[in-house]
Amino acid sequence: MVQLNQDFIKSIAKDMPAHLSMDDFISYSSKPLRPSIRINTLKISSQDFIALMAPKGWTLEPIPWCQDGFWISLDSDVQLGNTVEHLQGLFYIQEASSMLPPIALFSTKTDKAEHTILDMASAPGSKTTQIAAMMDNSGLLIANEYSSSRVKVLHANVLRMGVSNTALTHFDARVFGEYLYDQFDAILLDAPCSGEGTIRKDPLALNNWGLAENSAIAETQKALLESAFLALKTGGSLVYSTCALSKLENQDVCEHLRSTFPEAVEFESLATLFPDADKACTDEGFLHVWPQIYDSEGFFIAKITKTCDVERQKPEPKRQKNFPFTPISSKVELELRQYFKQTFDIDIPTDDMLMVRDLEYWLFPAGMKTLIGKMRFQRIGVKLADGLKKGFKARHEAIVALAEKSTGYELSQAQAIQYLMGRDIPLVDGGKPQGELIVTYHGSALGVAKHLGSRLKNTLPRDLVRDKIADSDASTTA
């Protein structure tokens, strides 16, 4: 059994609702988490994924608050993260409770196609990619991460999941209220926290728990929430979430925001967000998810509406200069569109921005037009292709983000494994060479290969090549 920090137990006992049992909390904290996944609807429907994986022994139990989330039971010890289906972005390994904040963000049905949304603390990318899927890759999603090493992980997951409507930033998120004041239709602040709710995943999470440290964390959370509120448009929605359990990092932080902007802050009740949500609902309408309620990680979710204008707290910063991208010429645009259509049967979206930098051709979300110059961006949209002396060379990320389902040369599982291990694929009766083409598995793009007649020449980027791939219906590896 996990040995819980006794100072933590004494402190959390004051915050636990009277109808919940500390014995149950300790018991559930000692149990391993049920593994859970979220199906990536940018690439496959949940119905099709379930039908696809059932013959492989995957039993999927619906998570009540996320229609694309499932607890998973397997017939054998499959290494989920090393399966072809995971590497090609058909699903994300995501804890069930962490699917709640994006669901709360979109609890009110709105037209997301025109929305500009901010994910203030994004890495590793589970909620960012969930939001992008819920937006169906439309609109604009700004994904920020303060840690430089975690930005790389975030980008890798955005690429793997086929997300194209996102721009990445690398800032202390306290700057957003200043630089992008009154800019966003919706904001998710999944704030850095003490991690009290993650004990089932990380038995060492509470080893260094201390009230003084948590109080310092709460002050940072308050500053981040104020920044988010200033960056939010009037009438917009803000979700504040943590994987902490104490009121100090949750209710108290939200109450601080209301006391700071009393006329503008309204708490929206989440009591009807999903069946039995009321079991975790507080008097304020927040969801305070304790591990024993839904057999999950601990989590906190609050939804806040900005009901009236709030004055800018600092003068508007000077515009950023020397933006390195320029719009491509109409001639090059036509050639680029023809190349993608004729070679890969891909129609480049017409509403987005086609930009160039040093013979690199990029697709920016249309919503970026109003943000260029206001802030520096780490990476915007999708890199489509590199310019050659004659023609173009498509980039892997463009193919996996823009290719339609079932467009390409379908591989068997054995061939897909060989492809992801960077190997060429021999062909029997391959016919005449066909040049560049998309290779797919389960009808979803894996990448590009060059058809040489007798084999498919592998062009997978070296940083994506894996030494071992797990069989998704057994624990053996190739």
Swiss-Prot record:
Q: Which GO terms describe its cellular component?
A: cytoplasm
- Where is this protein chiefly located? cytoplasm
The record's listing under CDD domains reads: AdoMet_MTases
Lineage, top-rank taxon, reads Bacteria
Q: Which SUPFAM superfamilies match?
A: S-adenosyl-L-methionine-dependent methyltransferases
Give the location in the cell: Cytoplasm
Check the record and name the Pfam families matching this protein.
Methyltr_RsmB-F, Methyltr_RsmF_N, Methyltranf_PUA, YebU_pre-PUA_dom
Top-level enzyme category: transferase
- The yes or no answer to whether the keyword S-adenosyl-L-methionine is present is yes
Q: Which GO terms describe its biological process?
A: rRNA base methylation
EC number(s) in its UniProt entry? 2.1.1.178
Picking any one GO molecular function of the record gives: rRNA (cytosine-C5-)-methyltransferase activity
- Tell me which family the UniProt entry assigns to this protein: Belongs to the class I-like SAM-binding methyltransferase superfamily. RsmB/NOP family.
- List, alphabetically, the PANTHER family matched: 28S RRNA (CYTOSINE(4447)-C(5))-METHYLTRANSFERASE-RELATED, NOP2 YEAST -RELATED NOL1/NOP2/FMU SUN DOMAIN-CONTAINING
Q: What exactly does this protein do? A: Specifically methylates the cytosine at position 1407 (m5C1407) of 16S rRNA.
Name this protein carries in UniProt: Ribosomal RNA small subunit methyltransferase F
* Gene behind the chain: rsmF
